[in-house]
Amino acid sequence: MAGDGHQPCCDLTVVCQHQQPAHRDGPDRPVWGSRSQWRAASQIGKELGYGNQLFVLVEVPEGETDTTGPMEEAADRLTAEMLTSGLFLHARCGLQEEELLNIVRYFAWNFPSFVGPEQTEDVKRRLDPQQIHQNVRRAATELVTPFSSLGTNYFVADPLGLMEVEARNSRGFSQFANFDLEWGSGNRFFSKDHKALLIIAEPRESAMDYKFAEQVVRWTRNHIQSMNAEPAFRDSGVRVTPAGAYVYAEQEHQFIETNIRRISMISIVGNLLLCLVIYPRIPLLLLSLLPAGLGILWTTGVASFYPGEVNLISLSFIAILAGLGDDQVVHFFNRVPQEWAKGGTLNDAVLRAFETTGFSVLLCIITAATATASLATSSFKALAEFGFILTVGMFMMMLHTLLTVPALMGLWWRFSKPRAPETITFRLLPWIARKCVDFVGRHARLVVSFGVGMFVLSLVFLPTIKMGARFEITGEDNPAVAAQNRLSARFGIEGSPHVFLIAGVEQEVLGRAEELTAGLEGYRQRGIIKSIFSPTTLLPSARTQRERASSLAGVNLAASARALEESLRENGFRTEPVQPFIDRLRILGQKNDPVTLETAARFLPPGLVDNSIRKTGDGSYVAALAFYGTDPDAIDVVPESVIASWRNQFGPFVEFSFDKMNRDMQNQVLHDSRRALIWTAAGILLIVYLCFHNLRVSLIVLIPIVFGIVGTFGLLLLVRHRFSFMSITAIPLIIGIGIDNGIHLVRRYLENKRLGILAIAKATGPALIQSNLTTIVGFGALMASSFAPLAEMGLVTSLGVALALAGGLLLIPAVILVQEQRAPTDRASEVDLD
């Protein structure tokens, strides 16, 4: 009964395959959107149930010898508790003898449907009456012994040994290639080295439901801990470890929560410490934090209604809004004492600050919201939610910056009015601004030359940027990954396969699956594909079954049945136990109806066939054809052009793999980010031009963001940074946030050109520095995330905002000074920005 390849029962290992679930933000709503790849992930998990298995490895330490008993005891106990918990459809650590015999009956009693061309002659020989007599005589002396009940039962189920023929070409049940079914008490899922025993369970709900997955894994871990607490179990040294899709789901949810807590805490604490250093009075500090605090609170309230639940990327809005919260209110705090110093009352100073700075604040919030709103148009759902929530947050902060904070300032000053203008300004920042601007005043041409040189050099190297091909959500030290690696090492059960998902009526699905299997077989023979698991090894199409049966059309099965009866009597056997097989031979001799899915389900164990092909609620069928590449890191195991040609030849199907889904997701994010970049750039250009009504002024206002974006990518290239798809997503944010520097500085300069750009830069500089520092801290907190794309966005945005600050505080004054120096006798005509 030996064989090699991928026999039907080896598809039991297919139900074991781990399918890492796509990131979910709720039990029913995919983060990725509605593209075919992502619909396929949902269909595989929900309708087909494919990959929704929980594995539990029962292992013993290396060097232990007699541990079979404790392993079986632990596996039996946990399996029994699973079945009574109400959380699992079925759970098993082996096959019952009757299940094994039913598999034999399924293939032996329907042998015309499974006999291939290369097996036809051997089967005909076994059906020959003379050969039947010889086989029965041999069975009487070799197969049936007082110590071989399985041999006896096997002989009763398949007295002609037809299953042995099918097994030679990978159609037998004996080769559970990953298990040693003969070790221990028998029929158990032991590893080949006998050091591990596997429990395979199918929970009631999909692994893509994070809440249910957490419940299942928590239940499993609790029961394992209770077993570990017992002295007898603890002394045995047996180790029990859950693995598979449900463990990945649980770990990813914990991963999300851990990352959000970490980056939010870093952003909030970092900005709080920064504000404590900068603001001289506690009430002023509290007022500066008010827009961020209320903005986060109100935005969270909106998000609770829509989208209802958020994902890892969109949850980062807490850290980002904590950094953006005081970006505009600091300009009020900076402007009010300056206006008060000109004379008049404090209330007059506040009103003048509103009249001058208020419009700039409004413009800056609108430009930032333009960038986030452009991301909200993304077809990639996670990015769209991120953009939407940030846009809501920006408008919430605008409301509190323009209305709530001034109102509270008025109330505060009724009880504690400042005695001098300088008591409500900043610490340290005016000194830093003066030093920077004085340097620009002394070396304007040097600053411009350095900025232009850096810009040009970065621009030259931009075409060499390459995006990373993939990213991993979890690392090798993650418990889910470690458990999956042990599962692979012990049982050869790999990670996520490539899957062709086929839908339609039953025979259409099976026919297409056979054609695709034949196409994949060529790649397996060339060594590109390691293994193929097709539903048609368990259930061939009716057409294939008829073709195979036709090759046996000349065999007189009625004569074979008579010969079997006679030989049984001649050798002293009772015919009653074998009568079902004899009757089946006679029926097959009269007619051979094709095997159906319902027939297969009656004979095969739960989880064997229904995870390969299943009837869905609307009466159609869904089948999963899975295969593994020889190179585990290969993404295009089968070229896209070949898959497209197969679709034209064989009909529609969905190609699915988490590696491909990863790549498609990155391509989608890149596409959406480029579109958001175009919309943001167009919106910002329009807003800036409508605000200043002068092309030359508009170009000067744009200096910080152009320098910031190009310089960021140039510097990262210089240090050989590996870019990911989220680098492009950061560009609209740099544009929307970095433009604030140019708007505030140039508008202030236009109001008081007679003071000169250096004086204006010194007056505006402290607010520019403070607003950018809090933003850098907010986005910089994302770099603490262990989710690589989020950390990438934090790095690129933080560096971009820092360079945009340099462009605003250094380059804009330097450019204006250089222009003034070129026309000292006609400054009004050359530098008049009106």
Question: Could you tell me what each predicted segment is?
Answer:
Residues 14-16, 69-197, 212, 216, ...:
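Alpha-helical transmembrane helix bundles of large polytopic membrane transport and channel proteins
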Residues 305, 321-337, 358-377, 382-424, ...:
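Transmembrane alpha-helices and their membrane-interface boundaries in multi-pass membrane transporters
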Residues 1-25, 407, 411, 415, ...:
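Signature of alpha-helical transmembrane segments and their immediate interfacial
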